[in-house]
Amino acid sequence: MGDRTEEEIRPLPLNSYTEAVDWINGLLPFGIRPGLERIELMMERLGHPERRLKFIHVAGTNGKGSSCAFLTRTLRECGYHVGTYTSPYITKFTNRFQYDEVDIPETALLELANRVVPLVEEIAGTDLGSPTMFEVSTAIAILYFAEICYPDVVVWETGLGGRMDVTNIVTPIVSLITNIGYDHMDVLGDTIEQIAAEKAGIIKAGVPVVSCVEQPEAITVLKTTAASKHATLYLMGEQFHYERLSVDAKEQQLHFKGPFRDMDFTIRMLGGHQCKNAAGVMMVLEVLRQYMAFQLEDEQMQDGFRTTFWAGRLEVIREEPRLVLDGAHNPEGAASLAQSLPEAFPYRKLHLMMGMLANKHHQGYLKHILPIVDTLILTEPDFRRKMDAEALYELVAELQGTEAKADLEIIVERDWRKALSLLESRTEREDLGVVTGTLYLISDVRAALLHQTDSEKGW
């Protein structure tokens, strides 16, 4: 058999899928450190696998996940093989890395994790410090797509911001900036202009960019950045428009008007914000069809939009009592939720269970959601950065006199399982129960209601 090399004889550092996920998650204490030096070094050491892939880069405060779902489903329906990289995940760590809407096999994740362990250890010993959990996940995603499954295109979601986000290591064929709002202000800045500048950081020289951004100050930032990069900008309200034709509890119909043609289509994702997301995605697909020779037939595109589903976004998880899950976690998300609930679901009383993370814009969120709530159940997600339920109650109490219904009932229950039981018992036949505030809470509640035993939930 011949002599084996020392490398072949050396035992693998990780021996199971669980060990691999634990190792990756164990990198979390190094935190979110914006900067591309570590991922650039990793890509260099791996032979630049990212250069062998075509990416659609998606950034934005809200709507990234839903937009990625629309893109993936519709491109699949049109016959393309699609890689998808998203975060956070709802059920399992493998949800982050999908090929043709199927999670990465646990064996492949283990193999790729073992591949990058020595690299991570090497970089950890330099002045750059250890790669973070998100950097390692991103490297694994690139290796999976470039060396194992070879998709025609990769739908590529930013983790945080854009300019200094790890995913910005790639040069895409088209970029999408869904919208801009107040989130992660500790990292991205506390004005719309500052946040817009971070998101606009994904705009690359000569690469077309689509956006549904609406604030005038954000539009100015995008136009300036795109012009400086000689990147064609397709802006909702200027280069493309949409009209909502109808809406009910099952679906919405839209009319899209773009620079190349018009089209009517239907989506089953609920809420007015999903119409904007869908219109932005339709514009991205039109760019691919018009300039990059993608073969996208009308009927297949319409089928793709109509069949797109994304867990935890105005998701009816149970009919009796009627319970809805929604991952809204910032003021803009709360505004969309407050508008969408009465529109999509007729109800007598609204009972809302919420838990949030500590680093969110809590008052802005509450101002949007409190006016429509009859019973508010405050709880805590099972996550290290959770907001204390009593502290959340104090914020609600400050706003109660001016923002809430006069007879609002507030319950504080730290244990989310007990809070869920309370929500179920309060929600009568004509009522609506909603769980919201963070995807980390949604994930646990969803797993409990669907009796999923393999839920891992997390970043």
Locations of regions flagged by a protein language model:
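Buried hydrophobic packing segments
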Residues: L71, L75, T138-F145, G280-L288, ...
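Acidic, Mg2+-coordinating active-site environments of NTP-dependent enzymes
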Residues: I123-T126, Y150-V153, E157, P172-D264, ...
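ATP-dependent carboxylate-amine ligase
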Residues: G2-N15, N25, V170-P172, E193, ...
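ATP-dependent carboxylate-amine ligase catalytic core
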Residues: L12, L36, E40-E44, H48-R51, ...
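Nucleotide phosphate-binding/pyrophosphate-handling subdomain across enzymes
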Residues: R52, I148, V153-T158, D165-L176, ...
